[in-house]
């Protein structure tokens, strides 16, 4: 008999196979000798109280051998000569998974990426980290793999109703991801492992007859004579690519793409986003609070670097943590040299002595009305940009970021000294109350005090704020028909993923890319 069993076991006993076998046998009310094999299907940690436990779901073989495990494999048949050509702008998760789905459906994807391939892109991160200079089309936001490649690689998602999440995980594993992402309740790849996975996906696309072009920034959409249907794109070097459809998966930082659409007279919409800071703590502090450790006690065996998720509402606006990076680093995520933007990342082992998270406040469209007359639907981008430029000026240039101890932020004073930080370009003492909008600061102050009651030390003497976090999501939505997924004014244009306002994170963007490819297949040929 092959069955599934859920068990709840304290650590470190949960790490021992024989202890698991006894717990399974007890749950099934059989002798442990009858359990001939077990395989992990899902695991999570229950740290709500002591003792800390693991919740395990196991496939169990009783009185017969356990079938061999078959890891996911993906084979993409070469597309035929007459296959539909689909132009995909952007090679983040939305674009790459759209391309893979096109291949599965017999269409030929033509992927155009403004930045460089992932290996060259990694080299271009050195100037921004070490010399404070951004390579504007090849950085933490732009280039093969998109923003998620070098900003952590979290795969946890709540978007379970948007499509086959398991298919996305299995595709990552088929291209080299650790199979543990199939069983972990909060899967994470790591910025050190994602590049090779992205390269493997590119190889799959090319081997099946697709194309991937780097340093190919799209500057114009090509339309039919009536201007009602898109038929291709033009890149900055003048090359034109034609196809039956254009999937626009350019990410939340491709501001020139929004301006291109606005200048064409296409409808764009304002949407909520969030701004704030990165908050950094010693990882040992977060471990101690989340795992109920005594002062100075090491993290117990079998426990990963602890994480947290915090959220509340203050005066009608959300205040929350964002993209929490246990054992991680704060990185410079600007896309132009006159701005400072911070983000977080972790490597696969999550073994940095620091934890960090975005700590942000919701910005509603009406909060950007000061920019509305000049910028219209792009008022949120103007709001972001103004804050990013001011952040650069406060930091003193060269990607240095303004920073402040949390207790000094609450007291409204510049920090006399700053702790060691993971942010490599460096930090400058500054009163962030004078940098962020007052409506954001007041909610941040109240949120810090509130969250400190839930997570002791969150607003303590070891907590550091680094400004500013502005790229949590796009402040613009590119509208699309709910049924066809095409732009309401331009047939054949499929706004996709996070940059279009329809995703938030790697997995939801990948799912949206798949949906867009499926919608292209359903589109009648003109």
Identify the meaning behind each predicted range.
Residues 1-54, 58-150, 154-526:
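Residues forming the flavin
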């Amino acid at each position: 008999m092959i069955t599934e069993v859920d068990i709840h076991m304290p650590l470190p006993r949960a790490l021992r196979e024989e202890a698991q076998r006894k717990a399974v046998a007890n749950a099934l009310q059989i002798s442990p000798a009858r359990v001939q094999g077990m395989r992990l299907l899902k695991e999570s940690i229950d740290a709500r109280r002591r003792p800390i436990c693991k919740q395990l779901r196991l496939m169990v073989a009783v009185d017969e051998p356990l079938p061999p495990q078959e890891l996911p494999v993906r084979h993409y048949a070469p597309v035929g000569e007459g296959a539909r050509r689909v132009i995909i702008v952007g090679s983040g998760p939305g674009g790459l998974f759209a391309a893979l789905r096109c291949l599965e459906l017999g269409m030929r994807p033509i992927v155009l990426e403004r930045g460089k391939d992932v290996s060259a892109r990694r080299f271009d991160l050195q100037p921004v980290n070490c010399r404070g200079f951004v390579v504007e089309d090849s950085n933490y936001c732009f280039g093969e793999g998109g923003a998620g490649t070098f900003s952590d690689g979290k795969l946890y998602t709540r978007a379970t109703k948007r499509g086959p999440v398991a298919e996305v995980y299995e595709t990552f594993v088929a291209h080299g991801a650790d199979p543990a992402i199939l069983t972990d309740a909060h899967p994470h790849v790591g910025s050190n492992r994602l590049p090779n996975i992205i390269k493997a996906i590119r190889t799959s696309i090319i081997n099946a007859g697709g194309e991937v072009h780097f340093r190919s920034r799209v500057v114009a959409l090509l339309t039919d004579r009536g201007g009602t249907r898109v038929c291709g794109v033009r890149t900055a070097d003048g090359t034109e690519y034609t196809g039956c459809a254009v999937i626009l998966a350019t990410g939340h930082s491709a501001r020139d793409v929004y301006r291109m659409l606005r200048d064409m007279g296409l409808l764009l919409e304002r949407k909520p986003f969030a701004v704030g800071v990165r908050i950094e703590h010693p990882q040992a502090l977060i471990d101690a609070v989340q795992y109920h450790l005594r002062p100075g006690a090491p993290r117990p065996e079998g426990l990963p670097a602890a994480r947290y998720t915090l959220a509340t509402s203050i005066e009608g606006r959300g205040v929350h943590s964002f993209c929490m990076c246990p054992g991680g680093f704060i990185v410079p995520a600007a896309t132009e040299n006159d701005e400072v933007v911070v983000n977080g990342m972790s490597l696969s082992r999550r073994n940095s002595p620091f934890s960090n998270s975005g700590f942000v406040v919701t910005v509603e469209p009406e909060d950007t009305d000061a920019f509305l007359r000049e910028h219209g639907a792009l008022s949120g981008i103007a709001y972001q940009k103004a804050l990013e430029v001011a952040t650069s000026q406060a930091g003193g240039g060269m990607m240095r970021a303004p920073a402040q101890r949390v207790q000094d932020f609450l007291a409204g004073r510049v920090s006399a000294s700053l702790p060691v930080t993971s942010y490599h370009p460096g930090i400058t003492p500054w009163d962030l109350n004078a940098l962020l909008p007052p409506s954001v600061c007041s909610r941040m102050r109240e949120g810090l005090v509130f969250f400190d009651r839930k997570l002791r030390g969150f607003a303590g003497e070891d907590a550091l704020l680094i400004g500013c976090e502005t790229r949590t999501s796009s402040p613009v939505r590119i509208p699309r028909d709910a049924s066809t997924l095409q732009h309401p004014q331009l047939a054949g244009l499929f706004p996709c993923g996070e940059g279009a306002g329809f995703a938030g994170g790697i997995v939801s963007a990948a799912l949206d890319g798949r949906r867009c490819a499926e919608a292209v297949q359903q589109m009648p040929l003109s």
